[in-house]
Amino acid sequence: IITASADPQWAAGIALRASVVATGQACQSIERVYVARAIAEPFLAALAEGARGVRPAFPPGEGGELGPFIFPPQAAKVQAQIDDALAKGARLLAGGTVERLGGGYYLAPTVLADVTSDMAVMREETFGPVIPVTIFADIAEAIALANASDYGLAAAVLAGSIAEAAAIAPLLEAGAVSLQDGALTSIVSDAPN
């Protein structure tokens, strides 16, 4: 959940990192983003710009930040979720197509706006670098949307202050709630190579 008081550029950076860590295949990757209407457009613009800057790590040894899917059938499942969302009216802001490069399947970070609860990407576990974004009117709506998921291993709250984030966290039905960061990814990012 990203509140109206959060800086949209800052929140976009965290949402991107938390959604694509380990190609979105980490158990605590953020799979759904709920952003306040007041900051939605600058947030979406920053998120899409950041996503377009992430490169596949192919060919090996030539840089890049994003690896392949670990299980080829997962690439097909994720592509089907993207296609379902687009067919039902989602807007594609970045990414969107799985590519076969060498022996692996890669997907650039995919940003979907205007997603709805009837889309597979919002109902199912994605396990890929897809960032579906729903805009909410007030924090009660955001909490209801977040808690409507069958999944709840991890959640995150980004706000203008730690106090605001901490007030929202106990209302979320999740095993772990990160405040001002994305689902414990700072631990992964700070780990030595």
Language-model segments: what does each one mean?
Residues 1, 6, 99, 106-193:
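Conserved C-terminal structural/oligomerization subdomain of aldehyde/semialdehyde dehydrogenase
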Residues 1-116, 145, 179:
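ALDH superfamily catalytic-core signature
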